Amino acid sequence: MARTDNDTWDLASSVGATATMVAAARAVATRAPDAVIDDPFAEPLVRAVGVDFFTRLATGDLTPTDLDPDATGGAGNMDRFADGMAARTRFFDDFFSDAADAGVRQAVILASGLDSRAYRLPWPAGTVVFEIDQPGVITFKSDTLARLGAKPTAVHRTVPVDLRDDWIGALEAAGFDRTEPSAWIAEGLFGYLPPEAQDRLLDQITELSPPGSRLAVEGVVSSPDADDEQIRERMQAVRDQWRQFGFDLDFSELVYTGERAEVAAYLGDRGWRTDSITATALLEKCGLQSAEDSSANFADVRYVTAVK
């Protein structure tokens, strides 16, 4: 079903299912030899969602080789996807660690999905971690982790609100202090926002961020109309491959393509000092193999860090 202005979802459908997909990839990456991440909550959270395809991946019942027996390395290759998510996860983990070392004690995770950083990272004493996502997503994850006996490693504040609504008011009502430096992440989010919504969100974060604040984002590539069809063909290839295993989701209906601002430049114009790294370089930095076919791993995605 195509996106609408007021669409909602759970973790088994629409955009929510992509959060479960990413958590399954983190579970795969956690089991890997010489793993670069350790997310002990990824597998149980995926199992709790109950999508059979992702549960089988997360538990190891279905392997990346099962999905790609001919080792074609195509767009649906789970080894490549898991490596990409491992590198991405490590990037944002390290970002929060660096922010903590710099003395930042407020962290904000936008569209947190099945992110478990509030439970698995070694936050300094006094750190407050705010998680923002749709109410159903927040409630499901909080309840599931409570049943697992998981305890937050920071002061944990959930903010059950859609980013299209008054999320700033909800965040401040939860105790966020805009006069204190903060560390923000937008991981795997911008592709699900129209270009103008991406700009608006960056402007809002800038407004809430005094000097000393930090931001890390996964920057989506601006795609001219000529590239849209190629992107959709890649997504259709993934859909066709995974449909054989009982999971059918049209990814092309979930994302927004087209021209959009380049994140580092946009932030630089608004007073942030930025740095960035490509997905390919990030994989290599993590000791993971980069894809020869850049279309498979969206190698031109850039991970941006910014300091106010």
From Swiss-Prot:
Name of the top EC class for this enzyme: transferase
Family stated for the protein in its record: Belongs to the UPF0677 family.
Coiled coil start-end: none
Protein name according to UniProt: Putative S-adenosyl-L-methionine-dependent methyltransferase Mkms_1061
Gene source species: Mycobacterium sp. (strain KMS)
Assigned EC number: 2.1.1.-
Taxonomic superkingdom: Bacteria
The protein's role, per its UniProt record: Exhibits S-adenosyl-L-methionine-dependent methyltransferase activity.
Example GO molecular function: methyltransferase activity
Keyword Ubl conjugation in record: no
A Pfam entry, by short name: LCM
Binding site for S-adenosyl-L-methionine: D133, D162, L163
Any one of the GO BP annotations: methylation
Keywords: Methyltransferase, S-adenosyl-L-methionine, Transferase
